């Protein structure tokens, strides 16, 4: 099947997802370390705001280094809580708390985050990621 929005390699139809489902899909793909599929969830450019730093990226794969994360002890991440703050036809604001976990399921990082999503022809896309505090995705 090759209709727009259908991705047979993942079996997901992005355009039918709600903003909250898009955030859950982000975590699933992050846990799979699937950089190409992660790139499809993000708008271009997208913005990462952590602590007092604001950065601009053209793709998610430009921002993340999964080997760096594995070397830091990361095995997978999980959403602890999630809440929709706002949604209209064009934008959505989702806040959530998440953890990074080790192979033994020990929590090695926890943070509050907010995703600003925008509606595009292919579905909801993450435009801005706000992290309350510091967070690293790579050595850069």
Predicted features along the sequence, with ranges:
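Short beta-strand edge/turn micro-motifs at domain boundaries
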Residues: 108-140
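A short local loop/turn or secondary-structure capping micro-motif enriched for an aromatic residue
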Residues: 57, 101-104, 134-137
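Short, mixed charged/polar active-site loops
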Residues: 54-56, 106-110
């Amino acid at each position: 099947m090759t209709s727009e929005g259908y991705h047979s390699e993942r079996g997901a139809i992005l355009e039918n997802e709600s903003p909250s489902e898009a955030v859950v899909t982000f975590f699933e793909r992050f846990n799979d370390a699937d950089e190409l599929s992660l790139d499809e969830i993000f708008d271009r450019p997208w913005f990462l705001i952590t602590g007092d730093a604001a950065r601009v990226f053209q793709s998610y794969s430009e921002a993340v280094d999964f080997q760096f994360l594995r070397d830091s002890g990361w095995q997978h991440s999980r959403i602890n809580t999630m809440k929709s703050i706002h949604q209209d036809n064009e934008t959505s604001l989702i806040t959530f708390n998440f953890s990074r976990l080790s192979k033994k399921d020990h929590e090695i990082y926890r943070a509050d985050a907010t995703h600003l999503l925008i509606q595009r022809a292919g579905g909801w896309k993450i435009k801005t990621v706000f992290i309350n505090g510091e967070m690293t995705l790579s050595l850069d």
